[in-house]
A protein has these predicted regions:
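Fe-S-dependent hydro-lyases/dehydratases of central metabolism
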Residues: 1-176
Length: 176
């Protein structure tokens, strides 16, 4: 078959050259490959250590999203790894929470130290007990949410919030 007969334009992408991206802080428009994150953090004086990792809420919180994160958690647990930072997972619905519990994903996430929260806006809109930093203290967090504006996630304008996929968030939580 000849794609040119059916499409105005054919775009070929070499999937071997793609890598996960992370955006932020303070805007979803500031994107970079994960491999550039440390360099950008140093160049911009971002805190290098992640203080919290957050998955779910209304975005990236489906059964499939959490399942992919749970798979990484399961493999990490087999190697004795744990999250180095507080890791919170918010399923997108009560049905999703019940299904991840039924299928063992909840157990996989908890095995690396994750806390699975009730379905709610929660940390995405700053509804969590954030007592690991002082008000006004500069820190970096990573989430799979779709909002990362200043003070959005914890009321602290000095929190630098980065956004990645659930898999990227799990990886960064394991690395700290």
């Amino acid at each position: 078959s000849n794609p040119d007969n059916f499409f105005v334009q054919v775009i070929e992408i070499n999937l071997d050259t793609l890598e996960p991206h992370i955006v932020g802080p303070h805007t979803p428009d500031l994107a970079r490959p994960v491999s550039r994150l440390k360099e950008d953090a140093i160049d911009n004086s971002y805190p290098l250590q992640i203080s919290s990792a957050l998955i779910g809420s209304c975005t990236n919180s489906s059964y499939e999203d959490i399942g992919r994160a749970a798979y990484i958690a399961r493999e990490a647990a087999k190697k004795g790894l744990k999250s180095k930072v507080p890791l919170m997972v918010t399923p997108g619905s009560e049905i999703t929470r019940a299904t991840i519990e039924r299928d063992g994903y909840l157990r996989d996430l908890e095995a690396i130290g994750a806390t699975v929260l009730a379905n709610a806006c929660g940390p995405c809109i700053g509804q969590w007990k954030r007592d690991d930093i002082e008000p006004g203290e500069s820190n970096s967090i990573v989430s799979s949410y779709n909002r990362n504006f200043p003070a959005r996630n914890d009321g602290n304008k000095e929190t630098l919030s980065f956004i990645g996929s659930p898999e990227t968030v799990i990886g960064l939580a394991l690395g700290g």
